[in-house]
A protein has these predicted regions:
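AMP-forming adenylation/ATP pyrophosphatase catalytic core
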Residues: 16, 136-142, 147-362
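ATP-dependent adenylation/nucleotidyltransferase module used to activate substrates
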Residues: 1-163, 183
Length: 362
């Protein structure tokens, strides 16, 4: 943030009721800023009944408990908390796209899209309209003068999910946890006596109530059972619908006899799932890929060819690559083979700690 505006900024903090956003709000409040908590109400379906036919699984997104926790934290810190209803834009931009991508044979990352179009992008617009100078969140990343960097805690770094941001958005974004480790954040939550200090982190997609998103897909997509084959043409069994599988997947491929088997290719025209029985099979690997919908955080495309590091999915190790133009898209060539290159996932480019940009695998 600008040095001359070091104190008493008007900041809207996205508060989910979790530990990270709660500590982010507490830190800013203790620094003397005028902080207001914003709880975002996203779309969620009615909780599906459990196996006994009674009750259901509580949706992790925008649950009553999450809102209650956010209010308890706001009261403890001493700041007002408001609820903004983003359910329509969330359903249209995130949920509908998530289902459409799976139906078309791609494996999307809804968190990337949500940060750009809803949680941060849309919130910034609304917050600015309401007179806030900045929006803050509990993301683990660092924003230094409009340049995005990895967080101090590399095990929790979330810069991968933020590559779609632009300069106008970064200008109004604060990430108070960027220079803290998760352990330090937990310690601060206890020090500040926040009521969510012991609350567990959520690891799954927020708008899906179950631990596995396949049940969600089964409810919302038209799935066609089909054949599971080897590349030699041998029929091994039947799949329950291609959107339920992703490249490199092992779990959930129900084939009797020898195994294990790994999903290697989906032929949507013929509705066939091709598998291999060796996790190191060359057909699970690739040396290049093409990306679309590319965003460069600086606002301008870099000089090509670009030699940098790429992350092909969240939590994956950075690998050396070269980026060149290929028609209207970009071609990414790796120095070593990469396993399970998955259409629909994001590739994010780095130079050391700095995020350059990224795109979606075609």
């Amino acid at each position: 943030m600008p040095a001359k505006e070091k104190y008493k900024l008007k900041i809207a903090v996205a508060m989910s009721g979790g530990v990270d956003s709660s500590v982010a709000a507490a830190l800013l409040k203790r620094q003397g800023h005028r902080v207001v908590g914003i709880f975002l109400h996203f779309w969620h379906e009615a909780a599906p009944p459990d196996k006994g036919g009674v009750g259901g699984v509580e949706n992790k997104c925008c649950s009553l408990k999450a809102l209650t926790d956010a209010r308890r934290v706001a009261n403890k810190i001493g700041l007002p908390l408001y609820v903004l209803n983003f359910s329509k834009i969330f359903k249209k931009q995130v949920v509908a796209d998530f289902l459409d991508e799976y139906q078309k044979g791609r494996t999307p990352n809804p968190c990337v899209r949500c940060n750009k179009l809803v949680k941060l992008g849309y919130l910034i617009k609304q917050a600015r309209r309401l007179g806030f100078a900045y929006v803050a969140s509990g993301h683990y990343a660092r924003n230094i003068a409009g340049r995005l960097f990895k967080a101090k805690d590399k095990t929790k770094d979330q810069s991968y999910f933020l590559y779609t941001l632009n300069q106008a958005e970064l200008k109004h974004l604060l990430f108070p946890l960027g220079d803290y480790t998760k352990r330090q954040v937990r310690q601060l939550a206890k020090k500040f006596k926040l009521p969510v200090a012991e609350k567990r982190d959520s690891q799954e997609i927020c708008f899906i109530p179950e631990k596995s998103h396949n049940e969600f897909l089964r409810r919302h997509l038209k799935l066609r059972p089909g054949l599971i084959k080897t590349f030699g043409g041998k029929i091994l069994g039947h799949h329950q619908g291609l959107p339920l599988y992703t490249i490199g997947q092992r779990k959930g491929i129900e084939i009797g006899g020898t195994g294990p088997y790994y999903a290697a290719k989906m032929n949507y025209k013929k509705n066939i799932l091709y598998v291999v029985n060796d996790g190191n099979d060359k057909r699970l690997y690739g040396e290049k890929l093409i990306i679309k919908d590319v965003n460069w955080l600086s606002g301008a495309a870099p000089k090509l060819p670009l030699n940098c590091q790429a992350v092909i999915r969240y939590g994956h190790k950075p690998v050396k690559c070269q980026v060149v133009k290929s028609g209207g898209n970009y071609l990414v060539k790796f120095t070593e083979l990469e396993r399970a290159i998955t259409p629909g996932q994001s590739v994010v480019f780095y130079q050391g700690e700095k995020v350059l940009g990224g795109g979606i695998i075609k």
